[in-house]
Every structure is written in C-alpha cells, then in structure tokens.
C-alpha cells in the first residue's frame, strides 16, 4: 500500500514532542495527589515546567486548585476521563470495571493531551505516572517520550509488591494462613501475615487490586532497570531501596508541605488537592487553648470509615482514658449512604472531653505544639507526616499497605505502638486505651525510647530534603539523567 501521509504526520509529531522542557504528571486519588503536587512544586523550583493531570472528578474536587496552585508559574493542569465523570461509581461498585474504563478513557485523553501540547509548541518531554497507571507509560512510548513511575508509598511496600509478582507469591500466600509464621524476603525486615498488604490474599476483600497491580509489576519487570521515584528518604529505608536489583529506586521524599519541615512559606501549606471540604478552622483556636503535648489527634484518612462496632470501642477507650482529643470523624454517609449517629449521652461526654470535626488541614494540626500523639490508620502520607513532625504514633492500620507501615512504625523506626485486634478484627477499648496511655501517660522506658526516635527521624527527614540532602541530590540527579536542565 502507498503511504497515505499518516506516517509522515506521526513522525513530525514525534519530533515536536521531543522538543521542549515539559514534564507530565498523572495522579488520581488524594493519597497520590498531595505528594504529586509537592513533587511538581520541587520540579518547578528546579526549572522544569509541569503539566499536572488527574481525573475530571478529582480535578473538580480540588478545592485549593483555584488559588495558590492555579497561579504557580510553571504549573498547568489537565484532566482526563476515567469514564465516571458524573460520580456514578460508588465506593462499593465494580472496581474491576472502573480500572478497565480508566485505561480506555484515560488512554484517549492522554493521547489528546500529548498531541495538543506538541501542536501548541509546548511539548511534553517526560511522563511521571502514578501506581496502576502503567498505560500512561505505554501511550508515552508511542511518541518516544520516556517515563518513570512515582510511588507514593514506602520502598518496603514497593519491594513487597515486586516480590509478590516475581517469584514469591506462592510462598507469601501459603504463609498468610499462619499468623505465627515469618516471611523472609531479601532486604526487608522479618514479616508476618499480619504485616502484609491486605490485597495479597486472593480471597480477601481487596483482591480486586491484584490484576492491575500484577500488570504494573510485570510492566516494570519488562523494562531494563526502570527508574522509580519513591516518597521516602535514604536514611529511612536504606535496605529496602536497594532490595530489588531490577529497579532503580530513587528516594526523593518526604514530599510534604514545607511548613512541616520548618519552612515559612504560608502558600505551601495550601499547595495540595483537598478532595473534602473543610467545615471550619476553629479547631486551631481550640488547640491554642490546650497545654503542650496534651492532645491525641485521631484520623483514619480520606477513605476508611470505622465500623459501628469499632467506632464504639474507640469512643469508650477515649472516655475511659480521659485524654483530650481532636478527632476527624467523617460521616458514613460519604461511603455507604447511611449516616452514623452517636447517642446523645456519649456525644455530650465526647464534646466535653475533646473536639470532633468532619475534616481538617492535617499539616496545620500536626505542627501544633498541643499535640501529644497521632492515632493514625497508617496511610503513607500520614505516616511520613508523623515522622517529620516528630510525633509518637498509635498505629491503627485498616487496609492495603497500612499494616506494613504499622510494622515499620513499631518495630523498625520505633516511633509508636501498634494496636492488636481480636479474632474478629476489632480492636477492643482496653487495647486502645493501653496504647494511648503508653504514649500519653507517665514517662517510662518505652515512652522515652519512642520520643527519642521520633525526634531522631524528624531531624533526619529535614536533612534529607534540605539543600544538598540525599533526597534533594537524588531529584537533581534524576533530572540530569533524563536530560532536563537544572
């Protein structure tokens, strides 16, 4: 067949794409959006123009996008469809179908974004994509655009994912049935079934993540030592960062607002993509009225909502302990269409002892001197923010990677204590109180060790991200290696 002209146009487009200094970022969930925005900010400070791409729905929900982030020189925004722009997919919906639609619609949108940018004279020259979006790298490669994965969880978890899909899956699955059995993997601490990511069990409630995760791991395995940017720092996970020879993991974290690192850039605290409306900011005034190190901060993240039974145990633990608390208590109506009520008597007692809010700006809370500890679900953003804040932790993991993060908190970094659930998976009130009393009570050997370690990691984190620190150097080296000027 004769050349119909398409080949020439494609070649010309590839040439257009290769010229320039534009870097595309793709992220979808808030757990990735906030560190991704911080990564964008760091890249911009090094002279790189960034196009930040996320789903239509996430972009619509990014409340702060309209002020600081929208006026940042060097940063532009784009959205792509995941097939559910009208919010028709519920949290308990068919997520296998969602991932399929995300790939189909997202691929079309990214193709349009790349071609439009090239035709407008601002070509994308590198793509950084988030976990489970490996199709973005496939699309980029058709235009000869190189790419790298941004992993917003710890290097230990990335190594676990890679091992699971590259020769160790059967071994891990066989030991998941025995809580007393240890799982030994190169470069990682000894782990038990209680420390494993929740989707590793093929029969578990999060098994729907296995297929897209397998696709991601196999995609990385087919490449020649691909670069992976990881939201951690060298001193925190030295062994895990070197555990997988087939991957070149580069620690570039902690990717958090400068306010937690001792910076004074007020706009940076709002350089995030809040997907939930903040009801008010009177919680800061409330914290101002409390003594130093006297408040327990409680948050289980943007996705998890405690069951009725578990929430009741937490309520009783708080009331019985007497500790003052600030609790980010989201309504169940956000997740299940059923609003949970706390009976009036308990609610009155809770309001006398502490404060409950539907949402807050966590960065502002964590840097407040009134905080004494952080009861957290151990999502990675919250975990690394606790480390940078120097706060002792009560680890209350719920799902996905959180049990692994809790293991690291308690046994590796030793900055907190982890709650132990009963055989039904419920953490009872006595156990919650035991952990709270340990980190908030009178000083003893374990409490003092936790406080010492919290201060140590706080300093090491700030050193890593500072000028000339390991993470600062790693990011500059990355840009030099991909031939983007700094």
UniProtKB/Swiss-Prot annotation:
UDP-alpha-D-glucose binds at residues 302, 360, 362, 380-382, 385, 401-402. It catalyses: mogrol + UDP-alpha-D-glucose = mogroside IE + UDP + H(+); mogroside I-A1 + UDP-alpha-D-glucose = mogroside IIE + UDP + H(+); mogroside II-A1 + UDP-alpha-D-glucose = mogroside IIIX + UDP + H(+); mogroside II-A + UDP-alpha-D-glucose = mogroside III + UDP + H(+). It holds the Pfam family UDPGT. Highly expressed in young fruits 15 days after anthesis (15-DAA). Its EC number is 2.4.1.350, 2.4.1.-. UDP-glycosyltransferase involved in the biosynthesis of cucurbitacin and mogroside tetracyclic triterpene natural products (e.g. siamenoside I and mogrosides IV, V and VI). Cucurbitacins have cytotoxic properties and exhibit deterrent taste as a defense barrier against herbivores. Mogrosides are nonsugar highly oxygenated compounds used as high-intensity zero-calorie sweeteners; they also possess pharmacological properties such as regulating immunity, lowering blood sugar and lipid levels, protecting the liver, and acting as antioxidants and antitumor agents. Belongs to the UDP-glycosyltransferase family. This is Mogroside I-E synthase. It comes from Siraitia grosvenorii.
